[in-house]
Regions:
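An N-terminal, well-structured beta->alpha segment
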Residues: 1-37
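Glycine-rich phosphate-binding loops that contact phosphosugars or nucleotide phosphates
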Residues: 33-176
């Protein structure tokens, strides 16, 4: 079983500080590479919230139609989607079967994909490294196993996605203290 919720909440300040200090240059460059395409941000559970943020920020930053979708939605995409969009796979631990199936499906469809995971050693990372399915920005969350609500993973993902799109060098776009 995961951590008690009070432990998760006590960890949040350290998580925010950690996420604010991680390098996002690789993910930022990958996003910029596909700035001329729409974004199909793939996430399930808490990562779907991160996918929704990524889709919104991609639309605002580049004016490209973007959408948060579940891994199951990847299987229902029109064939032409890979011509006009790139995938972004978000997964805290990179081990859920639905996310792995979505990565495989994006590869089969020829849809370029990037992604973010909070574990540098996971089935998603190994699959992507072996097949080129996605260019992943991998981080190693220092708080260990999340509790049921995955509060720290969610907060870290949101901050990393936000920092990817809204450069810390831009005035007025700093994380609150």
């Amino acid at each position: 079983m995961g951590k008690a919720y009070t432990e998760e909440m006590q960890q949040l300040p350290a998580t925010i500080e950690w996420a604010a200090g991680q390098p996002v240059d690789l993910l930022r460059r990958a996003v910029q590479l596909y700035s001329d395409r729409g974004l199909l941000a793939v996430g399930s559970g808490g990562s779907f919230t991160g996918a929704a943020l990524a889709a919104e920020l991609h639309l605002r930053a580049y004016g490209q139609p973007s959408q948060a979708i579940t891994p199951l939605d990847v299987f229902q995409l029109p064939a032409a989607a890979s011509t006009y969009a790139a995938g972004m796979i978000l997964s805290a631990e990179g081990k859920n079967h639905d996310v792995l199936a979505a990565a495989k499906q994006l590869l089969v469809r020829g849809c370029p994909a990037i992604g973010l995971t909070l574990r540098s050693d996971s089935p998603l990372v190994r699959f992507s490294d072996a097949t080129g399915a996605a260019s992943l920005a991998c981080f190693d969350m220092p708080w260990g196993k999340d509790g049921y609500l995955a509060t720290n993973s969610l907060m870290a993902t949101l901050i990393l996605v936000w920092r990817t799109y809204v450069g810390a060098h831009e005035t007025g776009h700093q994380l609150p203290k």
